[in-house]
Amino acid sequence: MSEGWNIAVLGATGAVGEALLETLAERQFPVGEIYALARNESAGEQLRFGGKTITVQDAAEFDWTQAQLAFFVAGKEATAAWVEEATNSGCLVIDSSGLFALEPDVPLVVPEVNPFVLTDYRNRNVIAVPDSLTSQLLAALKPLIDQGGLSRISVTSLISASAQGKKAVDALAGQSAKLLNGIPIDEEDFFGRQLAFNMLPLLPDSEGSVREERRIVDEVRKILQDEGLMISASVVQAPVFYGHAQMVNFEALRPLAAEEARDAFVQGEDIVLSEENEFPTQVGDASGTPHLSVGCVRNDYGMPEQVQFWSVADNVRFGGALMAVKIAEKLVQEYLY
């Protein structure tokens, strides 16, 4: 389709929405018309796309027949409100909210891992983007799985405040400023506890487990098509504004030397491998970048089948915007003509 695709971005004024517009332009995605959509209170705002200014429209007044592809990056409530109207109008929705992630007839896609499930995109005209933690984990693991197979995964994720939106980022900034000036913080704020210069575990819900940890396990099993996969996931709230970090223990089906694992990472898509005597950080290597950084690669002591590594990625640009755009690229290159 040489003239480009007409695209709507629901949640265009949010962090992921703005990063998605930037990513579409940077990767020269074939765009015909672009429609920036948000709630009524954001209508009329001006955004930049590809060197041009675009005006945000009220999603409630948008004619979905104008768009062929839509990126939904505004959360579950917005997805639930507009997905039926969009899909019934013939628009194909790439949804990042998690609302459809575990629906059996909706493809859940990490482009590097299971692009073949995109053949099912017409089941409901919806494709689900995994949580940014799942995308980060599987994008890093794909080269190792290809090299040595997969027996078991253990991952500890240190998540940034931006995972919970702008209010969380502002709350962390406010706490930090107060404490640096000797002012006590209000523990009734967004986090309910001091996060600045601190770490917070996540509490289990009524199901007896942590929602974010449960989502990683369920999504990884669905994407790898292995409901019995042994995977342990822990999530900790870190005092970082942007960028998630993961410490991963991967068990292969055969002995896999650390040097072999490093060679596999070098071949991985959108992976930057640190030198052996260096390591990546959220602040220095993740924030604002569209790639995954990996370091500290070594074998677990006395366990030649187990490889441990550290990864960092920008949850907004890599886990949010880039994953969605790469799904769209696969679609237009291989399935939509």
Curated annotation (Swiss-Prot):
Pfam families tied to this protein: Semialdhyde_dh, Semialdhyde_dhC
Matching Gene3D superfamilies: Dihydrodipicolinate Reductase, domain 2 (3.30.360.10), NAD(P)-binding Rossmann-like Domain (3.40.50.720)
Biological processes per GO annotation: amino acid biosynthetic process
GO annotation, cellular component aspect: cytosol
Classification via SMART domains: Semialdhyde_dh (SM00859)
Record CDD domains: ASADH_C_USG1_like, ASADH_USG1_N
GO MF terms, alphabetically ordered: NAD binding; oxidoreductase activity, acting on the aldehyde or oxo group of donors, NAD or NADP as acceptor; protein dimerization activity
InterPro entries, sorted: NAD(P)-bd_dom_sf, Semialdehyde_DH_NAD-bd, Semialdhyde_DH_dimer_dom
Superkingdom in the source lineage: Bacteria
Entry-linked NCBIfam families: PRK05671.1 (NF004224), PRK08040.1 (NF005957), PRK14874.1 (NF011456)
Family indicated by similarity: Belongs to the aspartate-semialdehyde dehydrogenase family.
Name of the featured protein: USG-1 protein
Species assigned in the record: Escherichia coli (strain K12)
Gene: usg
